[in-house]
Amino acid sequence: MLISPDLELLKEYQKAADGNIRYITVSPEVKGVPEAIKGMTDLGMKVAIGHSGADYETSWKCINEGAVAATHTFNAMKLLHQHFPAIMGAVLESDIYCEAICDGRHLHPGTVRFLLKMKGLDKVIAITDSIMAAGLPDGEYMLGVNPVIVKDGDAKLKYGDSRAGSTLTTGCALKNLIKFTGRSLEEILPLLTCNPAKMLDVYDRIGSLDTGKDADVVILDEEYSVDVPGPPP
């Protein structure tokens, strides 16, 4: 949310979506945002902070008002300075969840390891931040109204050098995390399953393979690639 929040308008959106707007990103420095977070939460939305140059104090105000996560941590976010910790300082100091784009481009592998050490395995959520080009060949695509060029899997705005999301898939994110950290599948898998489910308060239904939960199953082969079986003989 890059405009001042309008809870009545958000209520209309939520009604039109049959209550399915579950997650929203806000920029803490936008006027009225910290004060509106409780109202967004009451509408059934989990609130993340991100796409922001907010200062430390304003970011903490949002966290204290109920923000539960940071959107693609480190990216599109004012970084830590020893005299001005900014939003990054509040995110690392707090116990909110941190999203991480683990494609090896948005975050250096060492940065991923640093984030895991700072927050712990139970507070990091691996995301893709993918655009429509995910899983497709290199070429020109659209991100909203902006043309995007994908070269060697790297998506950047056609006019400029800024990254425009990623082409990462969840399966590749899993393999990257295992490679970046040297940790086991069992240690890394919750970053893509349990943690997001817990953050969204749906862990009673999805996020792990337990009796009574939805059979939301992905089968991996020995190399941790998604195993798509062929048709029966």
What are these regions (language model features)?
Residues 1-15:
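Conserved phosphate-binding/catalytic loop of the ribokinase/pfkB sugar-kinase fold
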Residues 1-4, 21-25, 71, 75:
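Glycine-rich phosphate-binding "P-loop"
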Residues 19-23, 41-49:
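Short beta-strand/loop segments at the ligand-binding rim of alpha/beta enzyme cores
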Residues 24-27, 50, 101, 191:
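Structural motif
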Residues 36-39, 49, 58-187, 198-203, ...:
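Active-site-adjacent C-terminal substructures of enzyme catalytic domains
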Residues 185-196, 208-209:
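Short, well-structured alpha-helical segments that form the helix of a local strand-helix-strand
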